[in-house]
C-alpha cells in the first residue's frame, strides 16, 4: 500500500529520517515515538559519564544527575512544541532562521556541524574504553578502537548504508535492559559508607559535573525531526515524550547511584562493566563491550548521517562552501560533507594520540556546543511559540537553564563561539562576493499548544 501522503512525500521523509523505519501506515505511534526518542537520548554517555561525574564531584554528582533530569522536562517540551508547529529536518538551524535570520542560522549550523567531527572521538572513545577493558589493552587499544569505529561509520555512510530503525531500537532496548539489570544485580553490594563525604570536592564541583552530563541528555532535539511523522503531533508528542522522560530518568539515576554507592572510590573507566561483573562474574564483561560498541556505532552513525546532510543543506542555502552541497538531494549521499566530518574526527584522534590527550578531552567542548544549540533553540522558541502558553514558559525555563549550563562550561564555550564566528565571517564574505540562494522554507503544521 502506498504511503498515505503520497510516494514523493514518503521518499522525502525517508531521506530526512533514514533511521525512522517504524512509521505505521497512519503515522508514528506513541510507543514508537517514545522508543525512538529513548534510543536517541540513551546514547554513549551512559557508558562512562557516571564514572566521570563521580570523579568530578563524588557522591554529590547525584545532585547533578537530578538537576539534568529536571532540566530535560522543559527542554523536551520546548523542542516537541517547535517540531509540532514547524516540522522540518533542519532542526535548530531552521528555527534560528525563522526567528533570527540567516546569520544566526549559519552560526549555529557551523557550530553543530564542526563539533560533530570534534566530538565523535568522545563518543567512540567511550566504547573504546570498554574494548580495551575487555581485552586487557591500554591506551593504544582504546585509540585504535576509537579510530576503527569512526572509520566504519564513515564507510557505512559513504555507501549510503544506514542502520535500520528496528536494529537501532533493538540496540537501545538492549542497553535499557542492561542498565536495569546492572542496577538490580549490583545494589546488594551497595555500601552507604561510599556516600560520605557527600561533596568531597565542594559544591562547585556539582556544576562542573553537570556540564559533563549535558552529553548524556543530548538528543531531545531529535523530537523536532520526528514530529512530522506522528499521526497527531499535538496529542502524541506529549505522550511519547513523557514516557521517554520517565524511562530515561529512572535508568540514568539508577546507574549513577549504583556507580557511587557500589563502586565508590574503585570506579573505573567502564563502570557498567564493573557493575555486571559484581553480579554475574567476569563472563559478563564481553557482553557489555559488544552492546557498548553496537550502541556507539548507532549513535555515531546517526550523527554522521545527520551532520553530513546538515553540511550539504547549509552549502545549498549558501551557509557553507557550495562544493559541499553535492549529494545533498533526496536519495543521494553527501560524500564531500561526510568526508569533512570524518577528516575532522580522525584528525582529532590523531592529535589525541600524538599529544597524550584522552579521548574525552573534547567532551566539554562538545557539551558547550550542545548548550549553545539549546540556548539558540530556546530563544527561537520564545519568538515562534504562542506567548504565555505552557510550552512558551517551558522555553523560558529551558533558556535560563541552558544559559547556566553554557556558563558552567567555562573556557570551553570558546570552541563553539569560534566555530559560530567562523560561520558568520564566511557568510559575510560570501555575501559581498555573490548573492546567497533563497533558503528552502519548512512546512507549517497546524496550531498546537
Predicted features by range, described:
Residues 141-189, 200-201, 241-245, 369-376, ...:
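Membrane-interface loop-to-helix entry segments
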Residues 46-50, 156-161, 265, 320, ...:
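Transmembrane helix-loop junctions in multi-pass membrane proteins
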Residues 320-328, 356-357, 375-390:
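Alpha-helical transmembrane segments
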Residues 94-96, 101, 133-134, 242-303, ...:
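TM-loop-TM module centered on a large, flexible mid-protein loop between adjacent transmembrane helices
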Residues 3, 8-51, 56-60, 73, ...:
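Membrane-interface "cap" regions at the ends of multi-pass membrane proteins
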Residues 366, 379-449:
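A generic transmembrane alpha-helix motif of multi-pass inner-membrane proteins
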Residues 12, 16-25, 61-62, 66, ...:
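Helix-loop-helix junctions that connect adjacent transmembrane segments
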Residues 52, 56, 64, 73-150, ...:
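Hydrophobic transmembrane alpha-helices that form the core helical bundles
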Amino acid at each position: 500500500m502506498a504511503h498515505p501522503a503520497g510516494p514523493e512525500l514518503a521518499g522525502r521523509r525517508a531521506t530526512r529520517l533514514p533511521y525512522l523505519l517504524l512509521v505505521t501506515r497512519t503515522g508514528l505511534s506513541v510507543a514508537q515515538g517514545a522508543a525512538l526518542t529513548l534510543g536517541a537520548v540513551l546514547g554513549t554517555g551512559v557508558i562512562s559519564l557516571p564514572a566521570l561525574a563521580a570523579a568530578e564531584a563524588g557522591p554529590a554528582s547525584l545532585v547533578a544527575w537530578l538537576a539534568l533530569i529536571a532540566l530535560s522536562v522543559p527542554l523536551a517540551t520546548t523542542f516537541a512544541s517547535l517540531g509540532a508547529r514547524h516540522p522540518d529536518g533542519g532542526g535548530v538551524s531552521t528555527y534560528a532562521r525563522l526567528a533570527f535570520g540567516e546569520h544566526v542560522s549559519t552560526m549555529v549550523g557551523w557550530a553543530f556541524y564542526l563539533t560533530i567531527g570534534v566530538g565523535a572521538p568522545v563518543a567512540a572513545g567511550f566504547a573504546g574504553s570498554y574494548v580495551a577493558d575487555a581485552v586487557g589493552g591500554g591506551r593504544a587499544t582504546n585509540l585504535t578502537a576509537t579510530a576503527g569505529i569512526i572509520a566504519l561509520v564513515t564507510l557505512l555512510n559513504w555507501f549510503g548504508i544506514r542502520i535500520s530503525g528496528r536494529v537501532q531500537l533493538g540496540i537501545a532496548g538492549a542497553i535499557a535492559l542492561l542498565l536495569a539489570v546492572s542496577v538490580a544485580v549490583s545494589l546488594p553490594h551497595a555500601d552507604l559508607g561510599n556516600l560520605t563525604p557527600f561533596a568531597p570536592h565542594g559544591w562547585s564541583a556539582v556544576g562542573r559535573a553537570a556540564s559533563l552530563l549535558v552529553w548524556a541528555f543530548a538528543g531531545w532535539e531529535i523530537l523536532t525531526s520526528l514530529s512530522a511523522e506522528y499521526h497527531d503531533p499535538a496529542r502524541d508528542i506529549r505522550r511519547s515524550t513523557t514516557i521517554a522522560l520517565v524511562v530515561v530518568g529512572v535508568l540514568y539515576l539508577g546507574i549513577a547511584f549504583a556507580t557511587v554507592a557500589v563502586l565508590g572510590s574503585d570506579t573505573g573507566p567502564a563502570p557498567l562493566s564493573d557493575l555486571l561483573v559484581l553480579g554475574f562474574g567476569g563472563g559478563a564483561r564481553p557482553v557489555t563491550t559488544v552492546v557498548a560498541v553496537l550502541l556507539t556505532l548507532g549513535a555515531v552513525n546517526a550523527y554522521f548521517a545527520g551532520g553530513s546532510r546538515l553540511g550539504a543543506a547549509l552549502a545549498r542555502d549558501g551557509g557553507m562552501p557550495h562544493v559541499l552541497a553535492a549529494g545533498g538531494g533526496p536519495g543521494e549521499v553527501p560524500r564531500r560533507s561526510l568526508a569533512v566530518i570524518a577528516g575532522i574526527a580522525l584528525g582529532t584522534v590523531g592529535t589525541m594520540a600524538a599529544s597524550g590527550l584522552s579521548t574525552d578531552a573534547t567532551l566539554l567542548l562538545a557539551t558547550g556546543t550542545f548548550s549553545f544549540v539549546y540556548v539558540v533553540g530556546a530563544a527561537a522558541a520564545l519568538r515562534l511559540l504562542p506567548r504565555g502558553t505552557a510550552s512558551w514558559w517551558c522555553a523560558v525555563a529551558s533558556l535560563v537553564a541552558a544559559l547556566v549550563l553554557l556558563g558552567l562550561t567555562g573556557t570551553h564555550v570558546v570552541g563553539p563561539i569560534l566555530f559560530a564566528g567562523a560561520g558568520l565571517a564566511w557568510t559575510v564574505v560570501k555575501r559581498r562576493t555573490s548573492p546567497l540562494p533563497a533558503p528552502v522554507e519548512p512546512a507549517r503544521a497546524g496550531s498546537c499548544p
